[in-house]
């Protein structure tokens, strides 16, 4: 079947009052991920043993990728027995911050009108729910720990799994560092301390972008 006309997004704005997610993503080898999980330095700063969850996320767009061209991503995620719809914008110039809105849903079905925030609704304006199609899926096993640093609190997520289209898949092994309190510089310092334990590299490519590249049949290893 004919593939949607998706492409790498460019530009994209962040409404001035948008809720902001500040996050640093690190790409690692699966074996190195296990090494870091057991590292003494991580145990010292972890607030507890952490939690593990299975996350299944459906990503939606129109057949001509109207949302991607607007620089936004619409996702519905299953977390246990809950369903959460998220709308995210592209990252700002520093590569860390982007707008993010979330709302609970009754099922794994997109509902753009469920967002109450006017900025979120404006980003989806003119895209009726009947025009949306399920483009790709991520299936992730996530271990999350809260890390207490001298000047920040960081949520550290170890993600393994796959991003899948109907006829292709891309493996995932990455760490997401999300700032909960403090300054964004703490994320980079934490990443440098991880680098003393394992090889890693910073990535600005989101799971959504990787999914769009699969849909567009780009080689998974290009531009990561």
What are the residue ranges of the model-derived segments?
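Phosphate-end processing signature that detects enzymes handling 5′-triphosphorylated RNA
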Residues: 6, 13-224
């Amino acid at each position: 079947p004919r593939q949607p006309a998706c492409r790498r997004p460019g530009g994209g704005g962040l409404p001035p009052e948008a809720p902001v997610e500040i996050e640093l993503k690190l790409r690692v080898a699966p074996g190195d991920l296990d090494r870091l999980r057991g590292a003494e330095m991580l145990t010292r700063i972890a607030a507890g043993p952490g939690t593990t969850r299975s996350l299944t996320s459906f990503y939606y767009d129109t057949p001509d990728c109207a949302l991607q061209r607007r620089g936004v991503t619409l996702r519905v995620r299953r977390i246990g027995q809950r369903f959460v719809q998220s709308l995210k914008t592209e990252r700002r110039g520093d590569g860390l911050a982007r707008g993010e809105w979330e709302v609970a849903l009754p099922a794994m079905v997109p509902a753009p009108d469920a967002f109450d925030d006017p900025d979120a609704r404006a980003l989806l304006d003119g895209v009726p729910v009947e025009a949306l199609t399920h483009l790709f899926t991520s299936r992730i096993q996530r271990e999350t720990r809260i890390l207490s640093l001298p000047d920040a609190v960081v949520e550290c997520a170890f993600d393994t799994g796959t991003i899948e289209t109907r006829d292709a898949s891309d493996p995932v092994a990455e760490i997401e560092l999300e700032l909960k309190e403090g300054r964004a510089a703490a994320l980079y310092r934490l990443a440098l301390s991880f680098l003393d334990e394992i090889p890693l590299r910073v990535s600005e490519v989101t799971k959504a972008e990787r999914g769009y590249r699969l849909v567009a049949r780009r080689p998974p290893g290009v531009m990561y």
